[in-house]
C-alpha cells in the first residue's frame, strides 16, 4: 500500500467526491453528506493507494485554537482531520492507521495537536480505532436523544 500527500487537483477532487458518495450511501454516519469541491478547498489531502486504485483518504486543515481550554491554550497550532475514509474492502487491514500516521508525521512540525470529530453510528468501533489503536485522548462528547 502506498500512502502519500497530494495537491488538490481536478482529478483528485473527482476521486475524493466519488469516494465520499460511496461513504454517504453506506449510511453509517449521522448526517454525513457527500463532498463537493468547496469542502476540499484549502485542505491537505493524503491518499492510500493499492494496485493503482485509491482505497482511502484523509483530509484536513491547520488552524489555531481560538479560545483556551482545559486541553490547549488559546492560539495553539492544530490540525483538524475533517475526514478519514477507507473503502469497506480495505477496512481492518491497516489502511486507516497508515493514513493517520502518515498525516501525523506530515503535520506535526506545524501542529501541537491533531483534532477530529466523528458522527459514526458505530461509536464503539471508532473509539477503539482512535483511542486504543492510534492513541488519541478522549476530550469531548456530544450526545443526543431523538424525542419524536
In which residue ranges do the predicted regions lie?
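Short amphipathic alpha-helix that is part of the acyltransferase structural core
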Residues: 1-32
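Active-site rim helix/loop that mediates acceptor-substrate recognition in acyltransferases
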Residues: 24-49
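Conserved beta-strand in the GNAT
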Residues: 47, 53-62, 80, 85
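Short hydrophobic clusters on alpha-helical segments that form packing/core surfaces
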Residues: 81, 103-107, 126
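Conserved acetyl-CoA-binding loop-helix of GNAT-fold acetyltransferases
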Residues: 86, 92-105
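Conserved GNAT acetyl-CoA-binding A-motif
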Residues: 107-119
